[in-house]
Amino acid sequence: MKIISNNSTNIDGVKLIQFERFMDHRGFFTETFRGSDFINKDLNLFPNGIMQSNESFSHKNVLRGLHFQWNPNMGKLVRTIVGHMVDLVLDLRQDSPTQGKIMAFDMPAKPTSISSSWIWVPEGCAHGNFFFEDTY
């Protein structure tokens, strides 16, 4: 896995992480997770290990409402495999300097894209998605 960039956002702790896809005439290959790559980029996002892994498919014009976890709190690493979604993040943390702030991240992904992005949604933040086309 090759992380190309790691950028902070206007919400404390929310990161936009871009990673490389390996392309050739057959399509693309992506190593979806390698813990050491996150640590090498000072992205220690999983101090307790990865707790859960999910995938979804959503049809065009679907809205998946704001989701968050309590007891235990859980951060989320969100990406589009193929399709187009906007991910919304809302900071619900009472002790956060960005409490109440909401951001939208446009996350299109085509099979021919040489890179793709994740949004890191830290514990205490809610997120939801709107899908502009059928999306994996």
PLM segments and residue spans:
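Non-catalytic, conserved peripheral segments adjacent to functional cores
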Residues: 1-113, 133-135
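Ligand-binding loop in jelly-roll beta-barrel domains
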Residues: 124-136
